[in-house]
């Protein structure tokens, strides 16, 4: 359309700073910091591939600069992990008890595995994620520890009130 040089990027689950607190990793961090239950769907055996947000940004930049027009690039983190293992890792990093983990009824149609094959971007553009999951999760936890006001305003309802004021009844 409009003769624009378009490439497509598809990615696995991102994590890192500013990750909205409704998602698995930030939700578990915020709840653990507040000693609230850590709700895990089903038995927690659903698998996700995790990609640190800065690695995803680097991949997008590389695709924009060096990608071929009309190509599709899958950007994956090589970090396939079960949700329960992610939650236990967060609990460990925060020095909290696994007793906070609460198993809840799984969502209908919940994907058992969500991951993509990033072989093409590795082969064609030489991209590989630079952040090891263990390092990325620690940076993410540190960010949430140092930016409580940001995420606490969101989970307190202040964000929802702002959103309704700005966009409600329009």
Language-model-detected regions and their locations in the chain:
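Residues that scaffold the ATP/ADP-binding catalytic core of kinase and kinase-like folds
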Residues: 17-18, 124
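Conserved catalytic-core motifs of eukaryotic protein kinase domains, centered on the activation segment
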Residues: 18-21, 43-44
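C-terminal substrate-binding subdomain of Rossmann-fold SDR/epimerase-dehydratase oxidoreductases
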Residues: 26, 32-170
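Short secondary-structure boundary micro-motifs
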Residues: 14, 22-23, 98
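Conserved beta-loop-beta element that borders a ligand/cofactor-binding pocket
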Residues: 1-17
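Active-site loop immediately N-terminal to the catalytic Tyr-X3-Lys motif
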Residues: 9, 21-22, 67
